[in-house]
Every structure is written in C-alpha cells, then in structure tokens.
A protein has these predicted regions:
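Short juxta-domain linker segments that transition from a proline/glycine-rich
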Residues: 1-291
Length: 291
C-alpha cells in the first residue's frame, strides 16, 4: 500500500500540477508494485549504490560521483544504449506523463506503508529522446548526490548527468584533448554515439577543457541562428525511450496464467479487446504509460 508521494524541494512550482502528477504516480506505482508481487520480481527494488549519497562540495565532485557510480554499476566507459531500461532494472520506476512545456522531468519518492520509498523519475512525454536521456541522468543525480548548500544543486546534477552519459576518457578519445575548432558534423556524429544533444556535448567539451569560452560562444551563436535552441530543436532527434518493464511483467503474468485477461487489461489501463489484439502483435509502436 502506498501512502503518498514526496517530490524533491521546488521540483514542481504549481500545486495543481503537483497534485495531478501525484495522483497519476500513485495509481501507476500501485499497479506496478502489484504486478511485481504477482510474478515474484523483487529483484527490481531500489538499493542505494555503495558509497551513496555522494557528497558534492564543488562541481568536480559531481563528475567524480558519476565515474564512481558507473564503476559500482559495472558500466565501464561505454555509452548506455537504453537509459530507461537500465534504471528500471536498478529499481527506479520511470514514468512518461504529460507535463507543462516548461518542465522536462522530476524525481520523487512514493512511500510504502512499511516506510520504504520507491524512487520514481517522471519524464514529460512531449520531449525528444536526447532531452529525455539527459533529464533521466539529471534526476538520477538528485537521487544519489548530497549537494552542499554553498553550490547550486541543479548545476551539480547537470554536471553529474553530463559525466554519467559522456564519460571523460571516451569523449577525450573521440574528440581529442585540445581543440581549436570543431565541426557541426563531428558534433552530430558524437550525438549519435552518446544519445545526447549537440548543446550538451558542447558544454561537456567546455567543462573538460577541450576548448574554451570563445568556441562555445561561437557554437551557441550558430545553434541560435539555426533555431536549434527552441522547438522543434536540433536536427536528427533521438527516438524517446519508453518504459517497458511494467508492460512485460503484465504480459508475462497473463501468459503464465497468474492473472486473468480482465485483470491484465485493468493493470495496463486498456480494454480486454485491445489487450487481445496486442498479445498477438509485435511491439512496433510507442505505447503510452497507462494513466
């Protein structure tokens, strides 16, 4: 049984939007926990990583935290193909729901009756894949970092997200340790590799000292001129990642006879007829998270 939802401080400024999000989250997480119990899947419960929360007293500490977390989770230095899937395997529930345009995502905790908390990252279903992945990593930062009051928590989480998605040594290997110029084509090739925006890549290169402020300003001047900093944003968008674990557990329980068709449809938030059609079809189109 869930008792409520705790959003991180100042995460949502609108009380109405917070109440709507909380109601949606409670409904979905209740069903999520129910299907986990039915199929006996306790392995996806959240266990805080070793050494966390990582103390951040300066922004470079956020970089080190990302490196240590990748090591703890045995990620190596390779890009993460599907961050949504990876986080769900670690016990973080990922939901995609509609939000206002000024909000990409937020992290909260759903409280169980026994006092334990389920971490939930909510992503605005309207955003593109590169913004989604960066937002997921940013909100993961809020979950695992302990940021000193003397520095900006949002900037620290941004630095963490950049380092988590674009490990230092890999980016240096691809781009070089010092550049006096970089082409737009290069940036878009790197975008395909890491699944992040060219703007995030440019900031990351600046943070690592690959190039300085003048090149960064020149790049952002070009981004502005091309209209890439406003909708529909830059070319070659990354496809959004959809949370799939909940659906898989429901179809698994149905196949194993652990739930009836009507119960599976209820959990998925669809009609029995729709369920019967989906069971026989490949998962070839994006399906929204049930509301």
């Amino acid at each position: 049984c869930l008792e409520g939802v705790e959003f991180r401080k100042k995460a949502i400024t609108s009380h109405k939007e917070e109440a709507t999000a909380a109601a949606t989250i409670l409904g979905v997480i209740e069903r999520y926990l129910e299907i986990e119990e039915i199929v006996g899947a306790p392995s996806a419960s959240w266990t805080p990583p070793a050494e966390s929360p990582f103390v951040v007293r300066e922004y470079s500490d956020a970089e080190h935290a990302a490196t240590r977390l990748r090591g703890t989770w045995n990620l190596g230095n390779e890009p993460i193909p599907n961050l949504t899937e990876f986080l769900e395997e670690r016990g973080v529930k990922v939901l995609r729901i509609p939000f206002s345009d000024n909000m990409d995502g937020v992290m909260c905790k759903a409280r169980k009756g026994n006092g334990t908390a389920v971490p939930v990252i909510i992503i605005n279903e309207k955003i593109n894949g590169e913004r989604q992945r960066f937002t997921l990593a940013h909100e993961l930062g809020h979950l695992v970092l302990d940021v000193d009051k003397c520095i900006d928590e949002e900037k620290a989480s941004h630095r963490f997200a950049s380092a988590f998605l674009m490990p230092r040594e890999v980016l240096l290997s691809e781009v070089g340790r010092h550049r006096t110029s970089i082409s737009i084509r290069e940036l878009f090739q790197i975008k395909k590799m890491f699944g992040v925006s060219v703007q995030a890549i440019a900031y990351r290169c600046k943070d690592l000292g690959i190039f300085g402020d003048s090149i960064l300003r020149g790049l952002f001047k070009h981004f502005n001129e091309q209209g890439w900093r406003r909708p529909p944003y830059e070319p070659m968008p990354i496809d959004p990642e959809s949370p799939r674990r909940f659906d898989r557990l429901c179809y698994r329980a149905l196949s194993e006879g652990q739930v009836s068709e009507s119960k599976a449809a209820e959990l998925l938030g669809i009609s029995v007829r729709n369920l019967s059609e989906r069971v026989l079809q490949p998962e070839d189109r994006e399906e929204p998270t049930p509301a």
